[in-house]
Amino acid sequence: MAMGKRKTCRHEPLFLAATDLPRTPAHPFYERLNQILAEHQFDPFVEGLCQPFYAEVLGRPSLEPVKYFRFLLLGYFEGIDSERGIAWRLADSFSLRAFVGYARYEATADHSTLSRTRRLIDLETHGQVFQWVLTILAEEGLIHGKTIGVDATTLEANAALRSIIRRDTKETYQEFLTRLAQASGIETPTREDLAKVDRERENKGSNKEWEHPHDPDARIAKMKDGSTHLAYKAEHAVDLGEGAVGAVVAVTLVGADQGDTATLMPTLGQAARNLQAVAADPEAAAQMNAELVREAVTDKGYHSNGSLLDLDETGTRSYVPEPDRGPRHWEGKQAEKKAVYANRRRIRGQRGKRLLRRRGEYVERTFAHIYETGGMRRLHLRGRENILKRLLIHVSGFNLSLVMRKLIGNGTPRGLQGQVDGVVSLFWSLGQVLQSVRGLANTSR
């Protein structure tokens, strides 16, 4: 046999027969996911929602909305953080092409087309797709709706601290320090002089004074590892009802400087609106609790007189651990006292302890799956609206994984691959045992 050599320069054929194109079987996970989407009429639903954003006749060729949303779902299932990475991964995989809806001979869309389509379709439409996915979960009996756990995490923004500018004068940080040094008598300050001025200055990271010119919605904040970055705060409302599996029923995005007590009620309000939209479907409503968002379970960061009073006034029972604040004084605060004491009684009961444990399990798990293995901890988009669009569909991918876990036992393609590897290992082990038994039998003879 003659040795062939890799051709570094070749002339591509002008025409290529369809039979000569590479063939590969569809990925069983994505094939089953596409079946679920087809059974629930995903394509007609999305096309109807997005019709107002496209020209009725003529117009330049575009990325179909059903392909666009499948693109974003791949970000979760493949653990890809950027739209550029999603486009590269799709172009390199025949099974992913089949999932999105590309023929073998079709060129896939690049990241700029994906970005342009995201800007074309508004935030409300992304929210409606998120609600549509929740309806699938409800029809499968995976949403209860009465008890909601809430927690938040920080996401690093695609913006560097060294690029921030002052809100009033639009000076850069370097220009601002230079002006302060000159005002103190240093005509030509060196780097050491600027560093000294910076160390001696108070309120260096004030969000009231500084912003990023290209991402004004991001806020200066300390991350969990102790570093300081421009960041956003993503807050999840997770279903914790009896028989629930931890579906995310609402996700909100705000600047990282907003406290937990300030964002609790808006997040619960969004959860209530989403669940009410889901309950409009009779089949989904039959599987859900008649009372929606009637219990809120959080960590101690959400505990305050005001937040507990707000929950009490809306008829929502709170299960919020109380931090040690020493002796409390209730003069003129009888309503706040009543709400705090009622919450204290609930968290000390057996049901309260059980719900707090469930919150720690289910809510924290959503952060691990969506932001760590799902690849969204570090953002690559700028602007709250752009990020929230991507985040809503990314979280929808997590919710769809709960449906897949119920139907096929695994929620991601990697999980299914691990299951197959386990079966292969089991058969290999059985084969080794059989060989050992046969060897012992032959020896005894």
What is each stretch, according to the model?
Residues 1-23, 416:
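Short, flexible loop/hinge motifs at secondary-structure junctions
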Residues 19, 59-62, 102-104:
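A short, ordered amphipathic alpha-helix with a cationic face
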Residues 22, 26, 35, 166-169, ...:
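Intrinsic-disorder-associated interaction segments
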Residues 26-73, 78:
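Basic, short loop/linker segments at the boundary and entry of helix-turn-helix/winged-helix-like folds
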Residues 54, 75-76, 98, 118-121:
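Short amphipathic alpha-helical interaction patches enriched in hydrophobic/aromatic residues
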Residues 80-91, 102-445:
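Anion-binding and metal-coordination hotspots
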Residues 95-101:
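Secretory-pathway/luminal and periplasmic proteins that interact with or process carbohydrate-rich
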